[in-house]
């Protein structure tokens, strides 16, 4: 019997994502000038106000307010009518030095023995539903949000768009877990009051009709241009569209809802598929295994599925604070393995093939680069691995331009080694 499964995404202008991007922009600025910096930076955004909190250990001084304003403006909050804009919002900073007790557990005389920054369990997941080994429901929801933001920033079509928006995609699966079709697309987008009645009042019905028409005739066709034939085949004439189903959406962003770093962890990962250990990513440097081990387990799961070990795989790793070696490694192939091995045997093989000590993960995935701002919107997983040039400026330092490799955990450079190890 078929079943339905849904995933959601949010835009870069969603309040929680504004907070995530501020936190990761600050992290990148520290790493650009001090690649040994330890950071745990939280941001809070509301009407006309940003609060930046957390713990940092670094030899460098960073202008937090300038980075926050630059980030907010880049997202698109540049107008006073939004009641939250980068040029005029108040910014309060409450950053203090990382605890000596925590630092003592992380730092070691030998880098290889660097302990985990905290206890906890982290998960990585991959499946063969899409070319980037992500759940198709989340992949589509993320792409809808990214494409809508591109349209907004181009300023040629749908010129009424404002930065805050959300999407949700529901997929019908067969009883053997194969995507069959798109059942429902939900989209809520912030917008201007752009149609008036003859008496000067807002014409809500006309605005909503226009937004729905543009979503179906402008946004969705552009989304389709980025899709493989396999995913395109899921579109059909019976898709249910819910566009701004509560009515007009003019008040939004941090003025409409308070935003906080780390509140979109399912959007950041697998859209409800797989599992999540509960630890957020943004604002944390790679000594925090909440982040680095989640990337490492994604790297493992993706390469394993790409190598043909299984059609779907979940990898869990756990740590004790201050201890380098993982406490446990767990694998679940959901009965979709292609090798004559129990999942526990696959887990043992992974432990032999991959070094999951925090310092080894940092080195393998190059996590001491200022590479994190790009992860803070539209998902940390399933993104394009590429080298980009980034420039960092500061009133306290000379401008610094450097090449940075993004999304290193999305590389498929272990496939041949895995095939050989598993006899595939």
Model-derived segments and spans:
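N-terminal, positively charged regions that mediate nucleic acid binding
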Residues: 1-40, 155, 415, 421
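Internal helix-turn-beta structural module
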Residues: 46, 310-312, 319-424
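Alpha-helical support elements that line or immediately flank enzyme active sites
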Residues: 12-31, 129-146, 284-308
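A short glycine-rich, hydrophobically flanked beta-strand micro-motif that places a catalytic Asp/Glu
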Residues: 37-41, 165-171, 239-243, 309-320
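C-terminal catalytic subdomain
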Residues: 265, 270-314, 325-332
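Short, charge-patterned binding micro-sites
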Residues: 40-58, 321-325
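Glycine-rich, mobile lid/loop segments that gate access to catalytic sites or pores
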Residues: 6, 66, 73-77, 81-251, ...
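Conserved phosphate/anionic-ligand binding catalytic regions in large, soluble enzymes, centered on
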Residues: 8-10, 14-19, 115-130, 250-275, ...
């Amino acid at each position: 019997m078929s079943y339905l499964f849904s995933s959601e995404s949010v835009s870069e202008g969603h309040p929680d994502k504004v907070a995530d991007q501020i936190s990761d922009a600050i992290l990148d600025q520290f790493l650009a000038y001090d690649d040994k910096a330890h950071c745990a930076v939280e941001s809070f955004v509301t009407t006309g106000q940003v609060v930046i909190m957390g713990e940092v250990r670094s030899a460098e001084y960073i202008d937090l307010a300038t980075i926050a304003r630059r980030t907010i403006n880049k997202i698109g909050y540049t107008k006073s009518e939004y009641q939250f804009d980068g040029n005029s919002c108040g910014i309060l900073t409450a950053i203090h030095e990382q605890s000596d007790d925590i630092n003592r557990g992380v730092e070691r005389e030998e880098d290889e023995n660097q302990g985990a920054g905290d206890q906890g369990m982290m998960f990585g997941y991959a499946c063969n539903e899409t070319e980037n080994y992500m759940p198709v429901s989340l992949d589509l929801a993320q792409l809808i949000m990214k494409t809508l933001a591109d349209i907004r920033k181009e300023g040629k079509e749908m010129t009424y768009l404002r930065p805050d928006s959300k999407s949700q995609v529901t997929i019908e699966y067969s009883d053997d877990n194969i995507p069959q079709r798109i059942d429902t697309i939900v989209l809520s987008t912030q917008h201007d009051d752009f149609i008036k009645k003859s008496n000067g009042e807002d014409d809500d019905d006309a605005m909503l009709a226009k937004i729905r028409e543009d979503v179906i005739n402008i946004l969705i066709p552009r989304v389709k241009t980025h899709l493989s034939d396999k995913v395109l085949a899921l579109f059909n004439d019976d898709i249910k569209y819910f566009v701004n189903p509560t009515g007009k959406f003019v008040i939004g962003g941090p003025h409409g809802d308070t935003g906080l770093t780390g509140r979109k962890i399912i959007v950041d990962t697998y859209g409800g598929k797989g599992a999540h250990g509960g630890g957020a990513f943004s604002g944390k440097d790679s000594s925090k295994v909440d982040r680095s081990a989640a990337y490492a387990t994604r790297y493992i799961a993706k390469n394993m599925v790409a190598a043909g070990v299984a059609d779907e795989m979940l990898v869990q790793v756990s740590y004790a604070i201050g201890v380098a070696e993982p406490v446990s490694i767990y694998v679940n192939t959901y009965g979709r393995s292609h090798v004559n091995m129990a999942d526990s045997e696959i887990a043992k093989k992974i432990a032999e093939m991959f070094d999951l000590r925090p310092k080894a993960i940092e080195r393998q995935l190059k996590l001491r680069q200022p590479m994190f701002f790009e992860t803070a919107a539209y998902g940390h997983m399933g993104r394009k691995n590429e080298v980009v040039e980034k420039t960092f400026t500061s009133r306290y330092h000379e401008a610094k331009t450097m090449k940075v490799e993004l999304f290193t955990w999305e590389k498929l450079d272990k496939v041949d080694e895995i095939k050989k190890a598993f006899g595939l």
